[in-house]
Amino acid sequence: MQQTKKLTHSDITIAVMSGPFLQRGEPALVSKWYRTKMALACGVDLVVELPYAFSTQKAETFANGAISILNALHVSEICFGSEDGQIENFYNTISVQKNEEETFNRLVKQFMNAGNSYAKATSEAFLHILSSEKNIDMSQPNNILGFQYIKAILMQNSSMQAQTIKRFASHYHDETFNDQHIASATSIRKQLFSENSSFTEIESFIPKATASLLASYKQNYGTLHNWEQYFSFFKYKLMTMSPEDLRHIYEIEEGLEHRILSKIQTSSSFHSFMESLKTKRYTWTRLQRACTHILTNTTKEEIYCANIEQHAPYIRLLGMSQKGQTYLSKNKKKIELPILTHTKTFDHPTLHIERKANSVYFSIMKEPLRTQLLKRDATHHPIRYDETTAKFL
């Protein structure tokens, strides 16, 4: 965050944040409201939600949704972390792909016909068309997402400029702590759910406010969220579905429904299910997203209706600093998308999916807490933060 502010000289900082489920197909560790507090305490001025219909998608759709929201908020610069760290290399790679589009598409099809996943096929296709050191490594997850952010900016004819910060010391999927002060999200999550989990083990890798809020959430609600806690619901859901039912679920295609229904019969945990389900054709992340859609009962038709315009239909405001509130007050007449401070009275196909996702997310809670949290989510107004006193209002 501090590097972003230093690089962009920003007046205010806006974060677009996923809701209950994330792009890699996992439930968020804690609720979006706790994560909003974390962001505000770390210097973000406005926190807005990326709807489920975009946040649990491949990089291209995820980026389109995020950029459409930032564009509507009249953001002048976007900053993202990447393995490459050189913004000009992203633009060079986009230019090469555009010039070699016919060859690129042919190669992707060729590699997919050989049984590779779409992600692997595109990575291999890029290897074949990119020869210069001024191009990015498209096998790296943060490079891929950054590439799609810039493509979305160009596609949406936005005047937004892009900046990137190089990731170092740890990689996205690292499962262990390889540095004294920097760790991947994967390694932090693994530590939090380990047999001898302790918040003290991760305190040197995350901001103090974040560690405090994580501990507070676990104390107040008795848990942090991961896939294993939803496995019994997930298995029950699949046990009551036919292959035809499953085919209606978003991202279930090419006969995947038969493999899923077969593998669930002998699986006693989500991890063991995923280990038996994965193939060369489908990445772990791609399968996890499909599982998320099964869990939330999100159909192809629902996603089509929600994403028909290919941009976010509204802006759900989750939190703001005093500075962020001033920015919104000054610019609200220029912002074309409706800004939602709660969702109780607003109606849209995208929001229908969101409500289901929230219901599922809180399903692991005991009553009456579960009902209280669901009711509160629809009526919850944006969290306000006074950055001068470092206190929530």
Curated annotation (Swiss-Prot):
Reaction equations catalysed: cytidine(34) in elongator tRNA(Met) + acetate + ATP = N(4)-acetylcytidine(34) in elongator tRNA(Met) + AMP + diphosphate
Any one Gene Ontology cellular component term annotated for this protein: cytoplasm
BP GO annotations: tRNA modification
Location in or out of the cell: Cytoplasm
Enzyme Commission numbers on file: 6.3.4.-
Pfam family, one: HIGH_NTase1
UniProt keyword annotations, A-Z: ATP-binding, Cytoplasm, Ligase, Nucleotide-binding, RNA-binding, tRNA processing, tRNA-binding
Record InterPro entries: Rossmann-like_a/b/a_fold (IPR014729), tRNA(Met)_cyd_acetate_ligase (IPR008513)
Binding site for ATP: 81, 142, 167
GO terms of molecular function: ATP binding; ligase activity, forming carbon-nitrogen bonds; tRNA binding
Membership in a protein family: Belongs to the TmcAL family.
Function as written in the Swiss-Prot or TrEMBL entry: Catalyzes the formation of N(4)-acetylcytidine (ac(4)C) at the wobble position of elongator tRNA(Met), using acetate and ATP as substrates. First activates an acetate ion to form acetyladenylate (Ac-AMP) and then transfers the acetyl group to tRNA to form ac(4)C34.
Designated name of the protein: tRNA(Met) cytidine acetate ligase
Species this chain originates from: Bacillus thuringiensis subsp. konkukian (strain 97-27)
Lineage: Bacteria, Bacillati, Bacillota, Bacilli, Bacillales
